[in-house]
Amino acid sequence: MMFNKQIFTILILSLSLALAGSGCISEGAEDNVAQEITVDEFSNIRENPVTPWNPEPSAPVIDPTAYIDPQASVIGEVTIGANVMVSPMASIRSDEGMPIFVGDRSNVQDGVVLHALETINEEGEPIEDNIVEVDGKEYAVYIGNNVSLAHQSQVHGPAAVGDDTFIGMQAFVFKSKVGNNCVLEPRSAAIGVTIPDGRYIPAGMVVTSQAEADKLPEVTDDYAYSHTNEAVVYVNVHLAEGYKETS
């Protein structure tokens, strides 16, 4: 049987009218299509919203050599240094706690979350317990230079991670300071502690007391992951350069 285009057109028109009359198609749909929408409203790099604790929107400051994947989000008072690689689905969201800082040559890999507890109350006063100080400056989250934040890891402020440190896959840092040249192996966690320089947390271990943190093993030359971060930083710096050239 041959298909009758005229009958098909009539059927489609009838169905459209029926749906519109039943309310299944919103009258505002046409308005949405016609509405002029700026790119900024849907940008993955944008200002934080105005809130009771923060009446001023702030836009991220990103070094021109850094690469932010279109599927990553960078929001609010965020500073991103030179040659930083931010991979797909990473979220750097400075809308509650602020500011967030990511140092030179660091990498924020797929699915990583950087966020923080509220750092300013509704009276505009700082919440000291939710702030970390690094070199005389205050942050909600601080990530040093040459740091690797591996896939799906989270650093939730107040928190700071020192230079040349590797935060492994699905590792977690909260209300903590992690020193320089440290390693958090996959699925390990530092909660409410200070990890001394040059220490590592074994895979799956959750460190919640300073006594535990002070007894952590040292990163030595024969430690399995002693040079992992160096290699990961090298790769991601070149990935950032490559993606910048093709974007």
From Swiss-Prot:
Positions of the catalytic residues: E96 (proton donor/acceptor), E118
Binding, Zn(2+): H115, H151, H156
GO MF entry, a single one: cobalt ion binding
Co-factor(s): Zn(2+)
Subcellular location: Secreted
Signal peptide stretch: 1-34
Transmembrane stretches, start-end: none
Cofactor mode of binding and number, as noted: Binds 1 Zn(2+) per subunit, at the subunit interface.
Keywords: Lyase, Metal-binding, Secreted, Signal, Zinc
Amino-acid positions noted as binding substrate in the UniProt annotation, renumbered to this chain: R93, S94, D95, Q109, D110, N236
Reactions catalysed, as given in the entry: hydrogencarbonate + H(+) = CO2 + H2O
This enzyme's EC code(s): 4.2.1.1
Subunit note: Homotrimer.
Alphabetical list of PANTHER family matching this protein: CARBON DIOXIDE CONCENTRATING MECHANISM PROTEIN CCMM, CARBOXYSOME ASSEMBLY PROTEIN CCMM
Family in the record: Belongs to the gamma-class carbonic anhydrase family.
Role played: Reversible hydration of carbon dioxide. Important for growth on acetate. As a probably extracellular enzyme, it may support a H(+)/CH(3)COO(-) symport mechanism and/or conversion of CO(2) to HCO(3)(-), removing excess CO(2) produced by growth on acetate.
Protein name, per record: Carbonic anhydrase
Organism: Methanosarcina thermophila (strain ATCC 43570 / DSM 1825 / OCM 12 / VKM B-1830 / TM-1)
